[in-house]
Regions:
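Conserved Rossmann-fold NAD(P)-dependent oxidoreductase catalytic core, especially the SDR/UDP-sugar
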Residues: 37, 72-73, 83-125, 129-130, ...
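Glycine-rich "substrate-gating" loop/helix at the edge of Rossmann-like oxidoreductase active sites
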Residues: 135-142, 163-174, 199-201
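N-terminal Rossmann-fold cofactor-binding loop
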Residues: 33-39, 57
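Mid/C-terminal beta-alpha module of Rossmann-like enzyme folds, strongest
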Residues: 187-244, 269-294
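Conserved Rossmann-fold cofactor-binding substructure of NAD(P)-dependent oxidoreductases
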Residues: 53-70
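N-terminal Rossmann NAD(P)H-binding glycine-rich loop of SDR-like oxidoreductase domains
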Residues: 6-25
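A conserved pocket-lining segment of Rossmann-fold NAD(P)-dependent short-chain dehydrogenase/reductase
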Residues: 151-172, 184, 188-191, 196
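Residues in the short beta-alpha loop(s) of Rossmann-like NAD(P)-binding domains
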Residues: 12, 36-38, 201
Length: 294
């Protein structure tokens, strides 16, 4: 079966919708699934050019039927959720899965050890499938990363900065990640590969915070916090059952070098441009507005 007919699993979110748009721009016939019946999910998929279908990957029979009807598949749910579906792919059927760059950064952490095990499961069941390991994904309200930082900077007069601010990041703009996934699906040379996907530039945590403050129109006032002490306090609160916006493990990893490892796909959107687009979207501007470099 040709790659004219593509299935996008998990298209109800921002990255999934961008994948649908990118595929439709290539002239593909796109079936796009969503699991959670959020208001407007089906309409958003239709507006992006896809045919919306509600699907839960846990429904193996329904997933099998959808996969069998597609030439290729892009699975946007994190790999610990989507890995079992690799066994449903036909031999040689093109597919793309999403993991995390942190698998290479902190493989001992429980969550990333689970992702690494899921990567191995996919490779065994579908050796032709490509696995993408994005760095920090940002660029839309609710991205869970820089949108949260943007909101905090607007709300408070100063922002806590973990440690000395020298830990490196290389965030990837969500639209670039979507296009990278589509490019990999159509590139037979990358089938079976594991690729990190990152933005074009590595920045220190301090530089990242400064760029975020500029985009948010917020003061560039940062208060260094001792990571070990703060992480210990957060860990105690977690053990007490409190739900916190930042986990102790996340805070500890803030000191790590999170630049991409191994085979790397570098994307185009500069951090300042992506952050400006994010700020505009959080102000109620159209998410359709493209940064200059995208």
């Amino acid at each position: 079966m040709s790659l004219k007919s593509i299935l996008v699993v998990g298209a109800g979110g921002a990255v999934g919708l961008e994948i649908v748009r990118a595929l439709c721009a290539r002239g593909a016939d796109v079936t796009a699934t969503y699991r959670t019946p959020r208001n407007g999910a089906a309409a958003a998929i239709a507006a992006a050019g896809g045919r919306a279908v509600r699907l839960d990957l846990a429904d193996r029979d329904a997933a099998q039927m959808a996969i069998e009807q597609a030439g290729g598949v892009i699975f946007t749910p994190i790999l610990t959720v989507s890995a079992p579906a690799a066994a449903l792919l036909r031999p040689g059927q093109a597919a793309v899965f999403f993991s995390s760059n942190n698998v290479a950064v902190d493989p001992q952490a429980e969550v990333y050890a689970a992702l690494l095990a899921a990567e191995k499961r996919v490779a065994a069941a579908a050796p032709q499938a490509a696995i993408l390991r994005p760095t920090m994904i940002y660029g839309y309200p609710g991205d869970g990363n820089l949108s949260r930082l943007n909101a905090a900077m607007r709300r408070w007069p100063a922002t806590p900065l973990p440690g000395d601010g020298r830990g490196l990041q290389q965030p990837v703009y969500f639209r670039d990640l979507a296009r990278a996934a589509v490019d990999v699906l159509f590139d037979a040379g990358r089938h079976g590969a594991i690729c990190a996907v990152a933005g074009p530039q590595a920045v220190s945590a301090r530089d990242l915070y400064e760029a975020a403050a500029i985009a948010a129109g917020a003061p560039k006032r940062f208060v260094p916090i001792p990571v070990k002490t703060a992480a210990a306090a957060l860990g105690a609160l977690e053990r007490a059952g409190m739900r916190l916006p930042v986990k102790a493990a996340q805070l500890r990893r803030s000191l790590d070098d999170k630049t991409p490892r191994g085979e790397v796909i570098l994307t185009e959107t500069l951090l300042a441009e992506g952050l400006s687009a994010l700020a505009a979207a959080m102000d109620g501007g159209a998410l359709d507005a493209q940064p200059a470099a995208s």
